Amino acid sequence: MPGLNLTRNEATERASIIKRVHSYRIELDLPKDKDVFSSKVEICFDAQEGASTFIDAITSSVKSINLNGEELSTDLADGERIQLPNLAAENTLVIDAEMFYTNTGEGLHRFVDPADGEVYLYSQFEVPDSRRVFPVFEQPDLKAEFEFIVRVPSHWVVVSNQPEVKVEEKECGCGRAKTWFFKPTPRMSSYITAIVAGPYEKVTSELTNSEGRVIPLGVYARKSLMPFVDAEDMFELTRQGFEFYEEQFKTPYPFEKYDQLFVPEFNAGAMENAGCVTYLETYVFRSKVAEALRERRAITVLHELAHMWFGDLVTMKWWNDLWLNESFAEFMSTLAAAENTRYAKEAWATFAASEKTWAYRQDQLSSTHPIVAEIRDLADVQVNFDGITYAKGASVLRQMVAWVGQENFMAALKVYFDKHSWGNTVLDDLLVELERTSGRDVRAWSAKWLETAGVNTLAVEIENDEAGNISNLGIRQSYAEGFETLRPHRAVIGFYNLVDGKLTRTDRIELDIDGELTVVEEAIGKKRPDLLLLNDEDLAYAKIRLDERSIETAIKHLGDIDSSVARGVVWGSLWDTVRDAQMPARKYVDLVLNNIGKETNSTALRTQINNLSATLHSFVAPEAREETRHRAADRLWELACVAEPDSDAQLQLLQAFINQTRTEEQYDNVQRLFEGELTLEGLDIDADLRWNLVCRLATGGRFSAEQIAAELENDNTANGQQYAAQAYASIPTAEAKAEYWNKIMVTGELSNMIQRYAISGFKSGKPELIAQYNEPYFEQIEGIWRSRSHEISMQIIGGMYPSEPTAELLERTEAYLASLPEDAAALYRQIAEARDGVARALKVQAADI
């Protein structure tokens, strides 16, 4: 994998030689039953005369290379790059090669549907994987027009960035085939081109955009999955997104059509291929799901649509400005949801519970980096699709918008799009427009917020007189060691008092916080509230420390706060407090168990359940862990039983109970639910919930391999195969663990999604069963990182890292990190992040007294 790297210096040098890439004409022959496919490309480009460079091409074989009419030796190809000597000022390059299909979700992924045996293909090119499908100058600033011609079996359809211009059918050696001819694209980067092929089914619609142009819409999925696709919801969200973005940006949608395709075994949430967006199939709901997942799908739809402007129309010059794509799409998707969809009431509460939690965690790891990151090579960028680039960037943009004003912000974006359409940009291209429209010193703001790392802490310092009125209120700002930056913050202080059993806001102060201490003069003389909530409305990006009185109020009445955003801020503040070892973990467990029953925001409920799970696993003192886990599972069962029938809370609380099951009595309840002897009013044991029960029963030694096989026979679908892999790997025997260790760590035979589920199963259950694999992990992981693809190795490095946080594990990890060679920086980062988690867990355990 490291041998496939491309450095920024190499890209800069190549861009100085390649003056302009005009066009690619790409002919693909895609058989359904082979491991390789034919790829023939003609590239027209201008270059520095007499210079030499290379083109990226990860090939099975290269049949021929022709540069300006001269046949070159195929020895110039090494399977990863093809050398191009003695370039002319104007060049035509023709390469005929064979490329590999993959089962890793990178390049051109091939999937066989177990339900009907049909073959499906889709491409995933970001960051550096269009080179797995056709020879290409794989860097974002060498834009070109792309014309695709694709031959496939006659019953397949092909979807790409542009509409097809014609489809020809004829007999060939392997039966009848169709050749699809697509219009050339506008100038774009190679990573947002796309090919999706197979017997996909589709639903169509259209919209009329702000120019009066009719935009065709399509939603695609596998035949066996199409009955579960909610195309109308996708179309509704898409129309709402189009309306909002075109109005805000004053820039029309830049492409001719907008197709959205659910594709199998997809690694990410979605990919913003221009006019041809791909989504993971988790967003097709064949069973009842938490409302949090429906809202996440909506945010993802809006996120990918925002990319049509941020990233596709205007693209970063190099990957250090990836945030110009991802932070903007992340922020704009929540803004669009809040201002133009049915999720208006909950969108920012969801942002607080999800994105902010992710950002704060990532920003406190040793791998944290500025939003505008230093990206030396592709290995750097592949690990920077993280909580900084996405969630912190979006959080900071929200702060910027509050600071410069939304109208000024959007006006700057219009000029930015007008100036740089179909081109590439750097940070300063945006800052100059923001300064012009707002009159603010945005560069100074950027230096503190975008170009430095770390999260500040804002703490309330409050005093009151004998009458209970505030006599002094200050906000003290601090920073973590090694990140000595104090930043300006726009924030709101909310005054909350108990009114008829609800914590209701009775006053607010909006202010700028800057420097070490900000005195809030406006608060002096006001009645001290039951809860003084710093960062009410969640505008600021900072860890929040409440005063003691407010903490006690929150612990007793968190579920009684009537604002979901305010609850989210309090939940987040208390979670940070326990993570920083300033609240005992068991006290936090009680806080969660006493309040989640009243939480109405689905994502907040999901986040608190996840935080509860992390606390039980890693933060509770070892001597109290089992008892606390048993008590927590019992309480989750009680909450599930009294939750409103058929509600979101009932489903989430029941799933949480299933995952925390430990005692024989708890397993009895799981088994009785599975067998139908026990029911909860309104609860349907549908396909996915049934598999949840199967996996947990397997973990507890109550479900055999033969029983799992029988379940799979009844649900031999992509979902069923994934769950079955998890269940098999969950069986608590040495033989089952050894079998899946071998499949994951040795043979590498599993596809990306099957491997993900298998890792989850392998790690479940009693830690002593897999403790013997701790040392083999360290012995094998560098070899896996060097030999497997990026996505596969990322899953294994993080997923198979020993799970029990102990002092011995911390010591072993430190020794391993010290032994890594310099060229393993990306591997070092991933292991170091795991090490950080162990170190934090040990610190929090010590405070759990």
List each model region and its residues:
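N-terminal, polar/Ser/Thr-rich
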Residues: M1-S38, P114-Y120, P140, R443-A447
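Extended, low-hydrophobicity, Ser/Thr/Pro/Gly-biased non-transmembrane segments
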Residues: G3, E98-E206, E374, Y541, ...
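Extracellular ectodomain segments of secreted/surface proteins
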Residues: H22-G50, V460-E466, I475
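Surface-exposed beta-strand/loop patches in extracellular or lumenal glycoproteins
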Residues: E42-T59, E138, E147-P153, G474-R476, ...
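A surface-exposed beta-strand-loop module
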Residues: A57-P114, P135-E138, C172-G175, E516-K527
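Beta-strand-rich binding/interaction modules
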Residues: S61-L67, V442-R443, A453-L534
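Hydrophobic alpha-helical and helix-loop surface patches within well-folded domains
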Residues: F182, E211-V214, G218-G482, A614-T615, ...
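Long, ordered, helix-rich scaffold segments
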Residues: G387, A467-N472, F483-T485, L498-R505, ...
